[in-house]
Amino acid sequence: MARKALKLASWTSVALAASGVYLYSNNYLDPNDFGAVRVGRAVATTAVISYDYLTSLRSVPYGSEEYLQRRSQVHLRSARRLFELCCANRGTFIKVGQHLGALDYLLPEEYTSTLKVLHSQAPQSSMQEVRQVIREDLGKEIHDLFLSFDDTPLGAASLAQVHKAVLHDGRTVAVKVQHPKVQAQSSKDILLMEVLVLAVKQLFPDFEFMWLVDEAKKNLPLELDFLNEGRNAEKVAHMLRHFDFLKVPQIHWELSTKRVLLMEFVEGGQVNDRAYMEKNQIDVNEISCHLGKMYSEMIFVNGFVHCDPHPGNVLVRKRPDTGKAEIVLLDHGLYQVLTEEFRLDYCHLWQSLIWTDMDGLKQYSQRLGAADLYPLFACMLTARSWDSVKQGIGQAPVSATEDSEIRNNAACYLPEISQLLNHVPRQMLLILKTNDLLRSIETTLGTRSSASSFLNMSRCCIRALAEHKKRDAGSFFRRTQISFSEAFSLWQINLHELLLRVRALRLACWVSALLGWLTRAPHRM
């Protein structure tokens, strides 16, 4: 009996050893691939974070200086633990972490500043894995498809990485290859997040982050389908074809699949790289203006919005043929399609914000689900204080003091913010994320909250609302009347913009004259 047991143990050991060698040789022996490891890590991190909040703030008077200080420390510790979890579990976790890191004025700064780093911390697939995906999806080896293929990726993201390659006909292309394990893990990861969010809500009733899970559940399958990304790229290129400053790389459909996307290779600097713009004599204000026009057109006029404009996805360059500044828009996996009702309400809301119509602000905020929290909603949309909203967001640029106040208030109003995010239409969530990403770019460029950006938004709102009215108009006379009203409103905006420029020019001349007088003054004495 003992001999049989020994023999069985020997054969079992051989089988396990052989399995281990096989798994190792095929690069599958990765703890992150085992569901139990990923689940255990996520559960443990959630438990530690929850325990920290429960115990660290228990004995401190709410709202006191000590409470605020301790809460900030807990936020920072928790953000770092969440960051480590995202880096360890990768894939979907990094994607969700990046989303949270983009919500600059909606979440405490400790979280956004910590998680923002995930945009540059995405894992890379090995060349063996890249070859495997290309072989499985395109049915050929890399050397059969490309004259050359750079092993080092141009960039890696949470779901994929991009390599530079040259086709046999000499064309230079960018090859986007999905990480091989993301597809299989994504649905399980989202289910795990859903369970954890529900569990945490039992401990903290004010913790309402199911909206984040719902968004991931809806959007991740679309982002993992690169054919969908290619269709989005072609749609937005056609939709914004009248903007000569926009470049969307062409898709090569013959070598594209759900996990591999081949596109035209376009070089440029990141949109937040001021040094690159200065070196290439690209006007920062012009780029900021173009970016604002492009997104206003997407949101207010077309209702088809690129929702991931972080700096790595928006490049700038000088056009080779004309030398004019050009924006290159990349990564078209995540778009938000706005319903007409939402788009028109959002147009009315921004018109109310721009022209300080407080009754309209309340009415359209409530139509969009803000209820009595409409002042907070206005602050979230504009990233301005309620005092600035009441005075007019175009009247004065945001100050460092106001910006700091808003960021601090995000921590104080976290329960109300999460409640609001659970009640607004789902379409609003990605719009808020997009707003914050664009605002971050403008802050880096030093062009935030310029009057011209609000005027461009207002132009698009007027056009969108007029187009809707003309479609519903029953007669030619009524359509003509609407067209005249639209033209008059646009003329008023143009006149207002002209007056602002004249005022700025006069101020510049006055300052120049004053500086000239000051430099000459010592010689007179």
From Swiss-Prot:
Main location: mitochondrion
Subcellular location: Mitochondrion
Keywords: ATP-binding, Kinase, Mitochondrion, Nucleotide-binding, Serine/threonine-protein kinase, Transferase, Transit peptide
Superkingdom, taxonomy of origin: Eukaryota
EC top class, as a word: transferase
Active site (record annotation): D308
Domain Protein kinase intervals: 148-477
UniProt: ATP binding residues: L154, G155, A156, A157, S158, L159, A160, Q161, V162, K176
InterPro entries found in the cross-reference section: ABC1_dom, ADCK1_dom, Kinase-like_dom_sf, Mito_struct-func_regulator, Prot_kinase_dom
Cited CDD domains: ADCK1-like
CC terms in the record's Gene Ontology section: mitochondrion
Entry EC no(s): 2.7.-.-
GO process terms (BP): negative regulation of mitochondrial fusion; positive regulation of cristae formation
Gene Ontology molecular function terms on file: ATP binding; protein serine/threonine kinase activity
Functional description taken from the UniProt entry: Appears to be essential for maintaining mitochondrial cristae formation and mitochondrial function by acting via YME1L1 in a kinase-independent manner to regulate essential mitochondrial structural proteins OPA1 and IMMT. The action of this enzyme is not yet clear. It is not known if it has protein kinase activity and what type of substrate it would phosphorylate (Ser, Thr or Tyr).
Protein family (similarity comment): Belongs to the protein kinase superfamily. ADCK protein kinase family.
Protein's recorded name: AarF domain-containing protein kinase 1
Native source species: Mus musculus
